């Protein structure tokens, strides 16, 4: 991963937010699928 030398910190925060949203989406999908399979 190449890191940009610019001091702008906004893309890093956006990437972190999108990463957390992706993990949350995977977690919710896993819970829904597990409840669907165990019913």
From Swiss-Prot:
Where in or outside the cell it occurs: the entry states: Cellular thylakoid membrane
**Where is it predominantly found?**
membrane
* Highest taxon above the source species: Bacteria
Q: Does the keyword Hydrolase apply?
A: no
Keywords, ordered alphabetically? Membrane, Photosynthesis, Photosystem II, Reaction center, Thylakoid, Transmembrane, Transmembrane helix
Topology relative to the membrane:
Single-pass membrane protein
The record's annotation in Pfam families points to: PsbL
User: Record's GO cellular component, any one?
Assistant: plasma membrane-derived thylakoid membrane
- Give a GO biological-process term: photosynthesis
Annotated membrane-spanning segments are 18-38
Does this entry carry the keyword Disulfide bond?
no
State the InterPro entries in the record.
PSII_PsbL, PSII_PsbL_sf
Family assignment? Belongs to the PsbL family.
Q: Which HAMAP family match?
A: PSII_PsbL (MF_01317)
Which NCBIfam families does this entry report, sorted A to Z? Answer: PRK00753.1
Record function comment? One of the components of the core complex of photosystem II (PSII). PSII is a light-driven water:plastoquinone oxidoreductase that uses light energy to abstract electrons from H(2)O, generating O(2) and a proton gradient subsequently used for ATP formation. It consists of a core antenna complex that captures photons, and an electron transfer chain that converts photonic excitation into a charge separation. This subunit is found at the monomer-monomer interface and is required for correct PSII assembly and/or dimerization.
Subunit-level organization: PSII is composed of 1 copy each of membrane proteins PsbA, PsbB, PsbC, PsbD, PsbE, PsbF, PsbH, PsbI, PsbJ, PsbK, PsbL, PsbM, PsbT, PsbX, PsbY, PsbZ, Psb30/Ycf12, peripheral proteins PsbO, CyanoQ (PsbQ), PsbU, PsbV and a large number of cofactors. It forms dimeric complexes.
Record's protein name = Photosystem II reaction center protein L
